[in-house]
A protein has these predicted regions:
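Short, acidic, metal-binding catalytic loop of nucleotide-sugar glycosyltransferases
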Residues: 2, 16, 24-42
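Active-site-proximal specificity loops/subdomain of glycosyltransferases
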Residues: 22, 26, 39-83
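C-terminal catalytic/acceptor-binding lobe
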Residues: 28, 152, 158-257
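Short beta-strand-to-loop acidic/aromatic patch adjacent to the donor-nucleotide binding site
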Residues: 76-96
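A recurrent flexible, glycine/aromatic-enriched loop bordering the glycosyltransferase active site
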Residues: 117-135, 142, 152
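N-terminal C2H2 zinc-finger "knuckle"
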Residues: 263, 325-336
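C-terminal recognition-helix end and immediately following basic linker
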Residues: 281, 313-327, 338-354
Length: 354
């Protein structure tokens, strides 16, 4: 008899400056194994999508989408679209025994989603989701997952709430769910924001507002159906009849809507900061380093292009004539440097005019 998963739990992960996230993740998986997911008749799959150290801010929404895509690809035969539930789960919320049963309760209406709200949660719940949200598969797919374009902390949960409402999915809130908060020293919103600001991890308010505006218009085209990623490594860390845990290191490749990475300076900037006419002049500068071309360079880099082009052409001309420029034209001896060639010319009759 083929196994049918009761839960697919999606956990987004990125180590931070405190180096505490890994221990939180280990604690969470152990709690899943010992307390929450112990029934062999209701097996759970946990997929942890770990964003690589790519120099960019954490993208929680895209990591959640990737975790689901990997689950569908690797465990498609075990996912029942009518019965399996999809859980979006932060790594710093460890469920207590009294909360375990709540994961397996279906929304009372379909399509529907249930938000497990932690007692004493530091965040206001209106207009957004908390750290643990349970969907039926139909509802999750109807929202098109999370937006892919929120690079940094904050905003993606507000966007996901708006998607859920726009998709006609009913939201049920389950108050006072019992979790242990694994993130220490940030008992208030102010402390949390202060820590994020110290590491420049937050999305700026102006940028967040613009992303929310764009997502309200484009959510059907940016989400599960617009994913680009590369799996760097994959490891099964738990394999029991009741629980399977897979950790994947992934390179996130989906860019945010309305933004593009400049080929010259590699900054992620709004499209309004770019000149499309510059593609012809800069494509050759980046094509050896980048495999995809969005056809835009920012205005600042466009201003610098004439000097950059001239400099690059001089370098290429020198490289093309390097062998000739290191060879004595009289005796055909080749030297390792121009200085060595000049010393040779000074010490011999080579190069003397008759």
């Amino acid at each position: 008899m083929r196994r049918r998963l009761a839960l697919v739990v999606l956990v987004p992960f990125r180590e931070d400056d405190t180096l505490a996230r890994r221990s939180q993740l280990d604690h969470l998986i152990q709690r899943f194994r010992d307390v929450a997911f112990v029934d062999e008749c209701a097996p759970a799959l946990v997929v942890v999508a770990k964003q690589t150290f790519d120099g960019r801010k954490f993208n929680r929404g895209q990591a959640l989408n990737i975790a689901y895509a990997v689950a569908r690809e690797r465990f498609s035969s075990e996912i029942d679209d009518e019965r399996t539930l999809v859980v979006c789960h932060d790594c710093d919320m460890a469920p207590r025994a009294s909360t375990a049963a709540l994961y397996f309760e279906r929304p009372s209406a379909r399509p529907g989603t249930r938000v497990l709200e932690a007692s004493g949660c530091r965040y206001a719940a209106d207009g957004c989701f908390g750290g643990v949200t349970v969907y039926d598969v139909e509802s999750w797919v109807a929202t098109n997952g999370y937006p892919n374009g929120f690079w940094g902390w904050g905003g993606e949960d507000h966007a996901q709430f708006a998607r859920t409402v726009a998709a006609g999915v009913r939201v049920e809130r389950v108050p006072n769910a019992a979790f242990d908060d694994l993130e220490q020293g940030v008992e208030t919103v102010e402390l949390k924001l202060a820590r994020l600001d110290e590491s420049n991890a937050r999305i700026r308010q102006k940028e967040k507002n613009e992303l929310l505006r764009l997502d309200a218009k484009n959510w059907r085209n940016d989400g599960l159906n617009a994913l680009r990623f590369s799996v760097v490594s994959e490891e099964v860390t738990v394999s029991t009849p009741a629980l399977t845990c897979v950790e994947i290191d992934v390179e996130l490749l989906s860019e945010r809507p309305g933004y593009a990475v400049c080929h010259a300076c590699e900054r992620d900037l709004p499209e309004s900061d770019y000149s499309s006419n510059s593609l012809r002049r800069i494509k050759w500068m980046r094509e050896r380093q980048r495999t995809t071309m969005h056809g835009k360079s920012c205005a600042d880099c466009t201003k610098k292009l004439p000097n950059q082009v001239a400099e690059r052409r001089n370098i290429e001309a020198n490289e093309a004539n390097l062998e000739e420029r290191l060879t004595c034209m009289d005796c055909a001896t080749k030297f390792e440097s121009r200085n060595a060639l000049f010393k040779h010319l000074a010490a011999t009759s080579c190069g003397d005019e008759d």
